[in-house]
Amino acid sequence: MSIIVNQIVLHQLVKTSQDENTVQLKTHLRDELLPITAETEQMMLQLHQEYHNKTKAYGVFQETSNFAQILNRTLENDIDFLAFSHQSAELLRQELGKYSFANDGTLILCQYNFLATDYLFIALLDSRYSMLVDENLEIKQTHYLDITQFDIACRINLTELHLDAKSTRYLTFIKGRVGRKIADFFMDFLGAEEGLNPQVQNQCLLQAVSDYCQQADLTKEQTQAVKKQVFDYCKGQINVGEEIVVRELSANIPTLNEQSFVDFAVSQNYGLEENIPPVRTALKSLTKFSGSGKGITLSFDAELLNSRIFWDEATDSLTITGLPPNLRDQLQRQTKE
């Protein structure tokens, strides 16, 4: 798959001083865009792929967003991309300086096209140090731009923003490993607030599937069979990197009480999006029971309940018949010691 880079530029944020709560940063700005070469396109393709694999949250611009105003002026050709990047770098410097975790970094802004969709990608990348051997077989220190490990990044789907300004998913940003501060910082920089919540959408989907089966008075086995079909479809979408298409999902499961699943979901006002980003951990509950606590971790297929695994609510206990062989072997070895 190819990527078409339309405009790209790099700037740097340099830390000059730091006190207990804030950091002083300055910007080092390029005065022209980067030339579009095979190297820049290869770098952007790798950044695109790395970003795709990261855990992301969705956002939408607030009405008072300074960043959105600058972006709109750029899209309307009131200012060029270089001027947009300079103003964005200054906004980022001001916002990032409020946080103690702020550090030096290379700011990349790129407008590109991938699979007939226009994107704006923004990331703050770290530089790493390593060693190299030169032509004289001498060892020297070098530093390079780390385009595989980054936490401060966002991407705006410009095509979706243009076609549907009320969309709740045109903006995504990385949910950083260092906690809420990264998410809060980037939301403030962008002037954005939470948009689509994939976890909530997945939970609503699961509830809709459960209610759909219940209103049709299906048996336990029939209900589990429908849930297995739903899970198989969703798992297939995850495997190919696609979203759950509710209408497509509906076509993959039986019509109950002469009403398709998609029509049932709409009539009951579950608030499901037409396309839903799948959350693997949430979808597992379609076919499995799982939980952990007090030193115990359990996970088993839902179809085993009341066949090999029995729950006694009164005594808050589970009875398991037919232990997994590897678990039985561990227990036998332990009792012999």
Swiss-Prot record:
Matches recorded under InterPro entries: Nucleoid_associated_NdpA
Signal peptide: none
GO molecular function annotation: double-stranded DNA binding; single-stranded RNA binding
Principal subcellular localization: cytoplasm
Places the protein is found: Cytoplasm, Nucleoid
Example of a GO cellular component annotation carried by this entry: cytoplasm
Protein name: Nucleoid-associated protein HS_0228
Source species of the chain: Histophilus somni (strain 129Pt) (Haemophilus somnus)
Lineage, uppermost ranks: Bacteria, Pseudomonadati, Pseudomonadota, Gammaproteobacteria, Pasteurellales
